[in-house]
Each structure stands twice: as C-alpha cells, then as structure tokens.
C-alpha cells in the first residue's frame, strides 16, 4: 500500500510540474528564429514582445492563459485535498472530492490546449507584425507538455475515483 501511495503522490506531483512548465515556459509555437507562447513572442532570442490588449485575438489568448492557470491551481488544490483525505477519510471510502477537482483540472488544460490548437492560425494571421516569421514554425514542447499533462491529470483523476482508503 505504501508503494502505491508513493506512486500516486509522485504521479500527481509530476502532473502539477508538467502543468506549471506548460503554463509558464515560452514554447507553444517555435521556429528557427522565434518562439512564442500565450504570454509573449520572442524573435532572435533577444527581442521579446509581451502580449497585451493591443494584440488582435487577445481575448482568445487570455482564455488560454486563464484556463492553464486554473488547471495548475486546481491540480495543486487536489493534491492538498488528497493529503487531507488521507487522514480524514474512514477506511473503505473513496477519494471522490480529490477526483472531481483533478478531473476539473484535466478539463481546464484540455480546453486551453484545444482553444490554442483551433485559434493559433487566426492569432498569427491577424497579428502579422508580431509574428513575421511564424509560418515556418511548429508546436513547441510547452504545447506538447500541456497535452501530456491533460493525459496525466485524467489518469490521476480516474485513479482517485477508483482508489479506496485502506489501513
């Protein structure tokens, strides 16, 4: 049981770390001479422009920002609730509250990555002065980490739903 508990805790912390890196790091769309994410655009590795309200489709990027932040926060809250439930639940009960919050985190990261996937081309086309060389880019590792975090939070949420507290 102790090994299972250690695995679940490590898996949850890994999920939270993936969410944090995907949210903060600047590599959602990358190319040879640039990298961009939902916070800023950098060309030549030195010239960075912060995305603000003068940006076309800013509300779309704000939706991605908000859902990624919310996903990270919910994942952390789920971890703390799991730790509390370890000491509070009676033997044989399930970690339903932890599961629900973790699955909400999963839903938020899925929404963020889906919005970015769907709207990326429009964002780049409408902001050509900010994205002069982005046609030759591809999805970066932060974007991929967001989708990996989606899978991890989903699996984690389902584990909590199935898991029962034992002695």
Swiss-Prot record:
Name the InterPro entries on file: EMP-2, PMP-22/EMP/MP20-like, PMP22/EMP/MP20/Claudin, PMP22_EMP_MP20
Q: What protein name does the entry list?
A: Epithelial membrane protein 2
Give tissue specificity per the record. Answer: Expressed in ciliary body epithelia, sclera, cornea, and retinal pigment epithelium (at protein level). Expressed in lung and endometrial tissue; expression is particularly abundant in secretory endometrium (at protein level). Expressed in placental villous syncytiotrophoblasts and cytotrophoblasts and on the membrane of interstitial trophoblasts (at protein level).
Determine the domain of life of the protein's source: Eukaryota
| Major site of localization recorded for this protein | Golgi
A GO molecular-function annotation: integrin binding
Q: Which Pfam families match?
A: PMP22_Claudin
Compartments reported by the entry = Golgi apparatus membrane; Cell membrane; Apical cell membrane; Membrane raft
Listed under GO biological process in this entry are: actin filament organization; actin-mediated cell contraction; apoptotic process; bleb assembly; blood vessel endothelial cell migration; cell adhesion; cell-matrix adhesion; early endosome to late endosome transport
Mutagenesis / variant outcome for changing residue 7 to L: In NPHS10; decreased amount of CAV1
Assembly and partners? Interacts with PTK2; regulates PTK2 activation and localization. Interacts with ITGB3; regulates the levels of the heterodimer ITGA5-ITGB3 integrin surface expression. Interacts with P2RX7 (via C-terminus). Interacts with ITGB1; the interaction may be direct or indirect and ITGB1 has a heterodimer form.
Q: Which UniProt keywords apply?
A: Cell membrane, Cytoplasm, Disease variant, Glycoprotein, Golgi apparatus, Membrane, Nucleus, Transmembrane, Transmembrane helix
Q: Topologically, how does it sit relative to the membrane?
A: Multi-pass membrane protein
Record: glycosylation sites:
44, 47, 52
Q: What does this protein do?
A: Functions as a key regulator of cell membrane composition by regulating protein surface expression. Also, plays a role in regulation of processes including cell migration, cell proliferation, cell contraction and cell adhesion. Regulates transepithelial migration of neutrophils into the alveolar lumen, potentially via mediation of cell surface expression of adhesion markers and lipid raft formation. Negatively regulates caveolae formation by reducing CAV1 expression and CAV1 amount by increasing lysosomal degradation.
Provide the Gene Ontology terms for cellular component. apical part of cell; apical plasma membrane; cell surface; cytoplasm; cytoplasmic vesicle; Golgi apparatus; Golgi membrane; membrane
Q: Where are the transmembrane segments?
A: 1-21, 67-87, 95-115, 143-163
Using the UniProt entry, name the condition the protein is associated with: Nephrotic syndrome 10: A form of nephrotic syndrome, a renal disease clinically characterized by focal segmental glomerulosclerosis, progressive renal failure, severe proteinuria, hypoalbuminemia, hyperlipidemia and edema. NPHS10 is a steroid-sensitive form characterized by onset in childhood and remission without end-stage kidney disease.
For this chain, the family text in UniProt reads:
Belongs to the PMP-22/EMP/MP20 family.
């Amino acid at each position: 049981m102790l090994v299972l508990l250690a695995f679940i805790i490590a898996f949850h912390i890994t999920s939270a770390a993936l969410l944090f890196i995907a949210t903060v790091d600047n590599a959602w769309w990358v190319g040879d001479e640039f990298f961009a994410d939902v916070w800023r655009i950098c060309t030549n590795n030195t010239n960075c422009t912060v995305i603000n309200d003068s940006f076309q489709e800013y509300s779309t990027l704000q939706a991605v920002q908000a859902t990624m932040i919310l996903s990270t926060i919910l994942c952390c809250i789920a971890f703390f609730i799991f730790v509390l439930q370890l000491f509070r639940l009676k033997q044989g009960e399930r970690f339903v509250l932890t599961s629900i919050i973790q699955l909400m985190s999963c839903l938020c990261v899925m929404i963020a990555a889906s919005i970015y996937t769907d709207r990326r081309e429009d964002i780049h086309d409408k902001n050509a002065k900010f994205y002069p060389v982005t046609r030759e880019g591809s999805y970066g590792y932060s974007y991929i980490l967001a989708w990996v975090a989606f899978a991890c939070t989903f699996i984690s949420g389902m584990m909590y739903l199935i898991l029962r507290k034992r002695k």
